[in-house]
Design a protein with these regions (language model features):
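Conserved phosphate- and dinucleotide-binding cores of soluble alpha/beta proteins
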Residues: 1-147
Length: 147
């Protein structure tokens, strides 16, 4: 079945696919039937807690629906750039932005590789092609253990 989005993109829906409105999508999230959610965030701590908003005095953002998505999904994956636009690490020992909820993320994917929270360090489970351990260690704001 072909579906054309509001912006003109065409998608081929597979059997089992569903299109729902905003309120029903959050009903699915709250029901506990969501297997995986993929989110972005400003920072993620080595403990796995994500800081995904800033306060008003920080001039940007609010948590939106991500606390509900993270709390309602069985598995939480973060997809983000390894450093912010100023070159500061986004994988850190302790977040400088507010932590939205204590939920621990399961996997962090950046352009440098795949990482899991390890408590006081990150576990690099896979590095991107051509990326060295030294590059990962230099770009990360917490210790990194390589699996």
């Amino acid at each position: 079945m072909l579906f054309r989005s509001f912006f003109g993109s065409t998608y081929n829906l597979r059997p089992g696919a569903a299109i729902v409105d905003h309120s029903r999508s959050f009903a699915i999230v709250r029901s506990g039937r969501l297997d995986v959610t993929v989110l972005g965030t400003f920072e993620v701590e080595a403990t796995g807690r994500m800081a995904n908003y800033r306060t008003l005095d920080m001039a940007s953002g609010c948590p939106g629906g991500s606390p509900e998505l993270a709390g309602g999904a069985k598995r939480v994956i973060l997809a983000l750039e390894h450093a912010d636009r100023h070159g500061r690490p986004r994988l850190v020992a302790t977040a400088t932005n507010p932590v939205a909820l204590p939920r621990i993320v399961d996997l962090i994917v950046t352009e440098l590789g795949w990482f899991e929270p390890g408590g006081d360090h990150f576990i690099a489970t896979e590095l991107a092609a051509g990326v060295t351990r030294a590059e990962v260690e230099a770009a990360t704001g917490a210790p990194v253990v390589f699996a």
